[in-house]
């Protein structure tokens, strides 16, 4: 199966630009566009200042996100070929029945081009808003079961679970293509999430994994599927990661040192640091996205933490280099099983003067990956 290439969808106002960007990316040849489901950014607003990023001049805080369901509906009307997916939503804020209905709605609007990217959720998008955030992996597994149950039946159904109980619940809407509901991809990283993916999901979209880590976790998924008697011939293994692109490799090292880029490493759990002989700035008991709530970190505390992040960590986890080097990195992931690759250009967060150049260079990356198929 030829490798597919995805791109991030624009997710901040103005809406007209979101639509224009989607149409342009489809015309360029991207196979998919991906939209996060966030209320809160991974960057604390305490470091979202003009001395750190010029973006703060026209976007006063980092927590600006359009709703992905509404956005994909709008984009789906003006595009014809490109797939649209979330990277990722979750069943903590969104009830499984709501997800089932929303994605069937998108399925009809896009004429069968939508993907339900689903994860177990992040503390930042739930706990501050008064939404209980516990047993999220079990909730994630149960939600997939409910969604598939509702998609498979147009008659009333009952369900007795740990988190949800349904009596005489019905979803009468059928998929755009009869018998072919939207695929469910997971943002799985831990062993249990990967095993659930192998048993229940149709695709996989992890992030911030090295090639070796990717290979290991995909192996867990395949083993779990085999034990469940599942055929993975239609399963699609994706990968998305932040990327830095430039005309000079050493200059991308300079950009990697930028405050906002190193801040992405704060979302990792302590285990990711410990396995590399490093210590997480927030301590050995820090559980990454299960603990991280950026609005609760002041400027001094955040900058101190970022200063403690080893360069070797971001160098290893964030693809960077020239277009040819990024193409080679994509090929490395493809060699261990990746079938759908999305590189999220964040070069401009490290050097805003590179915004135009970096997106032009990403076009070269797209062309290179496609031409090597």
Descriptions of predicted regions:
Residues 1-78, 181-182:
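N-terminal beta1-alpha1-beta2 module of alpha/beta enzyme domains
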Residues 4-16, 88-97, 178-189, 243-246, ...:
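Active-site mouth loops of central-metabolism enzymes
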Residues 5-9, 33-35, 84-86, 114-118, ...:
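Hydrophobic faces of well-ordered beta-strands that scaffold small-molecule active sites
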Residues 14-25, 99-102, 188-196, 256, ...:
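Short, acidic/polar
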Residues 26-27, 72-81, 103, 107-114, ...:
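Acidic (Asp/Glu)-rich catalytic clusters
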Residues 29, 37, 75, 106, ...:
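Conserved, mostly hydrophobic/aromatic
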Residues 34-66, 90, 122, 127, ...:
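Glycine-rich, proline-tolerant flexible connector loops at the mouths of alpha/beta enzymes
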Residues 136-175, 212-335:
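An alpha-helical appendage that flanks or caps ligand/catalytic pockets
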